[in-house]
Structures are given as C-alpha cells and as structure tokens.
C-alpha cells in the first residue's frame, strides 16, 4: 500500500489515509495544483496553513538540517506521536503548506502504521469538510471526499482524537513552548518528555 500511496502523491493526487489519530487527506506539499484540490475537497480557505507530515522522524530531521540542537532534541522526545509541532522556518521550507506565514512550519510524524514505509513528505489535513467532525473510520469520511480522492487507504478504526498542536517556535532560542490545541497528547506528557531531554 505504501507504494500505491507514494505513486498517488508523486502524480499530484489526493489520498484519504489513516494517521495515528484520525483519517486525513494528503497531497504533495510542493504542488500548488494538488494543494488547491485538497482544499477544494475540504471547502477550506487556501490561505490556511496545514502540517507537513513525514512518516519517520529520521526523514523529517534530514529534510530540516537547519534545526538547532535544542529543537532537534525536542523532536526526538516528542516524535513520532500524535502531536503537530509548529517550528520556526527560517528557510521558508514548504511555503505552499504554510499559508500566510512561510516562517512557521507545522510538522507531523505519526506513530508507525500502515504507511510507515512511505519516503515522501505530504501535506496533510483531517479528512472532513472544513469545521466538520474528525473521522475515526472510512465510514465517517464524507462520501464526497472519498469519491473526490484519487486513493483511499483503509486503516481500520482509529483512536479519533486529533493531534495536540504545540508551538515550539521559541523553544530553540528561549526554551519556551505552549499548547495551542489540546488533543491526543496532554500538556503534562509534553512537559515530561521535554524535561527528560
């Protein structure tokens, strides 16, 4: 399934896929056309940011060599896992996924699953209409989204709680962080993981 998924993304397609939290939509984060299709399926404004997902932490760290040592240690403490990390993005990597702020990158590395062998990064967003409920199973994914996608990957029933969003933009320089959206991982768990590093 990983090869089919990679082929879909590389061709500029949009896929419904299972993350470690809820079902998502994925596309090539460097393709303006693919991103426009994904946002059109969701009914989401094109200037809203979305996370870039790597399927292993090693690939994420390789793609972002400019990360400082403190930030890299934080990523090693928190990922893979059900957190979306907002990072300072001084080189404006993946600007099409960053919305109106190319200097902030949302990063996701899910816990291992059916797509762990995928080598390409994807831009990802939950597989729902903008503002809709987060789908735990394919049956809960809107029919129009399933039909509009080029590939649908079934990962069974998922936990159903979206990722926690944590802002680490000031972590590298000042050690500061904050949770912007509470989700599958608690603030206490994040604090504990960071303190252990």
Report each predicted region and the residues it spans.
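Active-site-adjacent structural elements in enzyme catalytic cores
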Residues: 1-197
């Amino acid at each position: 399934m990983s090869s089919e998924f990679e082929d879909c993304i590389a061709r500029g397609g949009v896929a419904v896929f299972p993350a470690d939290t809820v079902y998502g939509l994925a596309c090539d984060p460097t393709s303006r056309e693919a991103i426009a299709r994904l946002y059109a399926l969701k009914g989401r404004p094109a200037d809203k940011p979305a996370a870039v997902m790597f399927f292993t932490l090693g690939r994420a760290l390789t793609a972002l060599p400019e990360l400082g040592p403190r930030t890299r240690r934080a990523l090693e403490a928190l990922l893979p896992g059900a957190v979306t990390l907002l990072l300072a993005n001084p080189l404006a990597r993946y600007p099409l996924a960053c919305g109106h702020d190319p200097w902030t990158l949302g990063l996701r590395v899910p816990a291992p699953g059916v797509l762990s062998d995928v080598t390409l990064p994807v831009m990802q967003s939950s597989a729902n209409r903008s503002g809709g409920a987060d789908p735990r199973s394919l049956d809960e994914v809107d029919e129009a989204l399933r039909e509009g996608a080029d590939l649908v990957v079934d990962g069974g029933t998922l936990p159903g709680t979206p990722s926690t969003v944590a802002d680490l933009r000031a972590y590298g320089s000042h050690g500061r962080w904050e949770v912007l959206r509470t989700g599958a991982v608690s603030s206490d768990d994040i604090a504990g993981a960071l303190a252990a590093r």
